[in-house]
């Protein structure tokens, strides 16, 4: 009985898979055109995956990490950045030509103000596969601020002084208080 149930289960799974495979389509090649039989040819795959500038959504905080008092709308922007594969493991896809682009972004200070302003971002216009640089990690002479909550702190590499990424005004905007020991926004003590 168990064998029969198992066989029926696997047969149904196979039929479902084959039905889905029949209707699924390969990625479009150019201008939304599809290849016959849903197979993307090798040279097309190779050309589209090789190192080149490609539109990438980039988080604004990644580009402006010090502007933590603002909330940005939208929170990420479409930028041309180098991406793709190189033909050798010893190579990496890097920009060889860059330019700036200015975009209008809404900056919101919670419960205070909001305005649309211009922000500049770096775009890659040309990319090449170049030998990977050997990255030696610099000797860090500072003790970490907190092992468990590194993401809440900023550390000055010269003085080793730890400070909170959160600000008192950011916590107060959410009706909370900044706990300077943990760098978290906590409920006010009564």
Curated annotation (Swiss-Prot):
Gene Ontology terms: biological process: induction of positive chemotaxis; motor neuron migration; positive regulation of angiogenesis; positive regulation of cell division; positive regulation of endothelial cell migration; positive regulation of endothelial cell proliferation; positive regulation of focal adhesion assembly; positive regulation of mast cell chemotaxis
Q: What is its main location?
A: secreted
Cross-referenced SUPFAM superfamilies? Cystine-knot cytokines (SSF57501), Heparin-binding domain from vascular endothelial growth factor (SSF57593)
Quote the InterPro entries the UniProt record gives.
Answer: Cystine-knot_cytokine, PD_growth_factor_CS, PDGF/VEGF_dom, PDGF/VEGF_growth_factor, VEGF_C, VEGF_C_sf
Q: Name one Pfam family in it.
A: PDGF
Record keywords, A-Z: Angiogenesis, Developmental protein, Differentiation, Disulfide bond, Glycoprotein, Growth factor, Heparin-binding, Mitogen, Secreted, Signal
Q: Which GO terms describe its molecular function?
A: chemoattractant activity; growth factor activity; heparin binding; vascular endothelial growth factor receptor binding
Q: Where in the cell is it found?
A: Secreted
Q: Write the signal peptide boundaries.
A: 1-26
Sites carrying a glycan are 100
Q: List the disulfide bonds.
A: 51-93, 82-127, 86-129
Its cellular-component GO annotations read: extracellular space; membrane
What is the documented function of this protein?
Growth factor active in angiogenesis, vasculogenesis and endothelial cell growth. Induces endothelial cell proliferation, promotes cell migration, inhibits apoptosis and induces permeabilization of blood vessels. Binds to the FLT1/VEGFR1 and KDR/VEGFR2 receptors, heparan sulfate and heparin. Binding to NRP1 receptor initiates a signaling pathway needed for motor neuron axon guidance and cell body migration, including for the caudal migration of facial motor neurons from rhombomere 4 to rhombomere 6 during embryonic development. Also binds the DEAR/FBXW7-AS1 receptor.
Subunit text: Homodimer; disulfide-linked. Also found as heterodimer with PGF. Interacts with NRP1. Interacts with isoform 2 of BSG. Interacts with CD82; this interaction inhibits VEGFA-mediated signaling pathway.
Similarity remark: Belongs to the PDGF/VEGF growth factor family.
What protein is this chain from? Answer: Vascular endothelial growth factor A
Q: Which organism's genome codes for this protein?
A: Mesocricetus auratus
User: What taxonomic lineage is listed for the species of origin?
Assistant: Eukaryota, Metazoa, Chordata, Craniata, Vertebrata
């Amino acid at each position: 009985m168990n064998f029969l149930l198992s066989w029926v289960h696997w047969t149904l799974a196979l039929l479902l898979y084959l039905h889905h495979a029949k209707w699924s389509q390969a990625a479009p090649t150019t201008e939304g055109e599809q290849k016959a039989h849903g197979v993307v040819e090798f040279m097309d795959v190779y050309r589209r995956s090789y190192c080149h500038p490609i539109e990438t959504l980039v988080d604004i905080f990644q580009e402006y990490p010090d502007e933590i008092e603002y909330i940005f709308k939208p929170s990420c922007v479409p930028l041309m950045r180098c991406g793709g594969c190189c033909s050798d493991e010893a190579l990496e896809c890097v920009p060889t030509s860059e330019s700036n682009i200015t975009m209008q972004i809404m900056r919101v200070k919670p419960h205070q103000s909001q305005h649309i302003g211009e922000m500049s971002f770096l775009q890659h216009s040309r990319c090449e596969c170049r030998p990977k640089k050997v990255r030696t990690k610099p000797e860090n002479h500072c003790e970490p601020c907190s092992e468990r909550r590194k993401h809440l702190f900023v550390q000055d590499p010269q003085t080793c002084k730890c400070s909170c990424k959160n600000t008192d005004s950011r916590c107060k905007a959410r009706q909370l208080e900044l706990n300077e020991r943990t760098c978290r926004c906590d409920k006010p003590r009564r």
